[in-house]
Amino acid sequence: MEDDDGRESFEINDMDLEYAMNPGGRRRFQNKDQATYGVFAPDSDDDDDEQGTSRGPYKKRSKISAPMSFVSGGIQQGNKIDKDDPASLNLNLGGEKKPKEDDEGSIQIDFDKRTKKAPKQNGAQVFAGMRSSANHGAADINQFGSWMRGDGNSNKIMKMMQAMGYKPGEGLGAQGQGIVEPVQAQLRKGRGAVGAYGKESTATGPKFGESAADAQKRMAQEGTSSRPTNDDQEKSGLKIKGSWKKSQTVKTKYRTIEDVMEEGMSASRPASHQQSQQYSNIKVIDMTGKQQKIYSGYDSFSMKTRSEYDTVDDEERTVFDVPELIHNLNLLVDLTEEGIRRSNQQLISLKDQTTALEYDLQQVQKSLGTEEQEAQHIKDVYELIDGFSSNRSPSMEECQELFRRLRSEFPHEYELYSLETVAIPTVLPLIQKYFVAWKPLEDKNYGCELISTWRDILDDSKNGRKMTFGHNKTKGDEIRAYDRIIWEGILPSIRRACLQWDPSTQMHEMIELVEQWIPLLSAWITENILEQLVVPKIAERVNQWDPMTDEIPIHEWLVPWLVLLGDRIQTVMPPIRQKLSKALKLWDPMDRSALETLRPWQNVWSAATFSAFIAQNIVPKLGVALDTMELNPTMNPEYPEWTACMEWLEFTHPDAIANIVTKYFFPRFYNCLCLWLDSPGVDYNEVKRWYGSWKARIPQVLVNYPTVNENLRRSMIAIGRSLQGEKVGGLQATPIAPMAPPPPMAPHFTQAAPVQKLSLKEIIEYTAGKNGFTYHPQKDRYKDGRQVFWFGALSIYLDSEMVYVMDPIEFVWRPSGLNELIQMAQGAQG
């Protein structure tokens, strides 16, 4: 019982109880009236007759009370035919519809297709091999699609569609957007998937609501046929059932040898046209046929004969069906096709081998011709060299002509067999004889033209060839012939000249010699001359140099070598700085010679090295000069110490000069100014002129420093306070000695008693303790007879009031200042 809202109730009714009590009994189903009206349905005796099961309706129960009825004798019973009944004579074998009442006298017979006997009629009466292999359905194929024809239910469906607005010949839908022609089923041969046998054919048929005759007439008017032609059927291998033609010509298409070979070629194409090699050994299970088949890979699966996919009509199988014979025939066909494909593959392989052998023959013939030509060239080279060797004493010109011919006439053999090595036994003795008496420092151009000619003939450095031909090479053979001639023929003379050379007096001669021969020498020979001959000789002369006694300054004969030696000369710089530091210990800042001595090294040493050297050796001397400078203009009107100090701004950073001016000059300057201002009868105009003259002497680069500017401002404040009558000096002013006009005399103040100076060893010991460094002698280690000490992690020794430290970077002993020593010790510990 359904509710009003359309939902079904799950309550238990009488039918459920009856089914539960008697599960094995016959179940009663509701008829249409019972399902509609339920318990209000009218009772009827035919209820049991209308109810049915899945097997069909029950037979009506015979009613005992009903009168007995008889069957007429003219009605067909079983397989008997009543001759008086015209309907039983209608041989409607084609499955056509029953004629109407007005056509009862006509008998329609369809001879277009054979009738099939019922399965029970075949039996054993059919000859063996001719019976059907399967029971066919009893449905008539001509009744298929009868709904599309204009009879029966089709008229009712069409009338209903026209009542809803459908127009014949147009698409379905409100706007007619539906398809006009229905989808037609087209039989595909074989059992493969869509697209397995090429492009799918398109079937044509009648439109919705159109009969077959109308569709045929329409397609005839459009120039097409409603069915595929015989040729199309033959090409597609299909046989359309239910064809409207009475007869159809069946043509047999035979497979040719070309078709079989084409299949073999497609299966044996290169890997670029086949599937990947990873699929070659995959197991393939074919379940498209009646029996399951297993293939070793996709290649073997593609080699199946096409006959396996050909379909056989069920109608043909009813005529002839012997599976064993069909299997044997198919097996013979497969073996034959396999033999054809194998023979074709062998033929193709033989053709490929023939082509490869022909190509190899051509290459061998070509190689043979080339080798014969090379053999002839080698024979000619041998004859040329053998003829030259017969000459006992060849000249230099004859040797040059020989090698020119070898390079021009036999270039391939010259490079392949390194024929330039022939020059070693022939040309080298001539070169040694030519340069045996040569003095390079006296005649630097001697033999340059000759060596330049041999370089053009023998040198192959452009090609990058450096070794001779062959596998059994000695150490001497690894050198090119031209380099070996230079090494053994010319370099001995240059070595003798370098051993006798004095770098301080013959600097220009050696530089000109090296510059003249560098373009003619290889890079490694030039490197050998500079590092093994020139630099050691310069280092030896630097060790002998004494800046206090030598008349020729070292920079005059050493600095010009920078262009040729470059960084190689840096090895002699530490001894030079060490000796200059010793020479500057007794230097007087008023001596201008130090400026000229150090000026050439400003661009030779690095900026940091040069600044450190000035800070250690020059700046302390300048500070002492400013500290002892006389400020009284009557006694020192020009102040040469100040001028000498300001000249070093060219070589050092202004910070260093500003520090010594602030430390040594301004305290004395301010003290002198205060004494003068506090003296009785002071002339402020003279004081202002004296102050202005000193301010003008200070360079602007120093005035910009805050410490210098602050000291000048302090002096101006003192002058201003003195003008107001205040005492600006902390000490009582002493009387000023009379000064002769016009230059005013500055007051002479009493110098403080000199403080007792500490020794250098005591200063180093005090500095080490103040900064937390260890300071003690090293066991059994001396430098030039002096004890070496540990200063933190550094090694130092004292010599003539000078501290020498082992440079941790250059590993040489060099002089060092106290501040630099502290910084180096801190860096070594950090």
Curated annotation (Swiss-Prot):
Residue ranges, compositional bias (Acidic residues): 1-17
This protein's GO CC annotations: spliceosomal complex; U2-type post-mRNA release spliceosomal complex
Encoding gene (name): stip-1
Signal is among the record's keywords: no
Its job: May be involved in pre-mRNA splicing. Required for embryonic development and survival.
Source domain of life: Eukaryota
Chief location of this protein within or outside the cell: nucleus
Tissues/organs with expression: Detected in muscle cells from body, pharynx and vulva, in neurons from head and tail, in pharyngeal gland and in tail hypodermal cells.
Protein name: Septin and tuftelin-interacting protein 1 homolog
Region annotation (Disordered) ranges: 1-122, 196-244
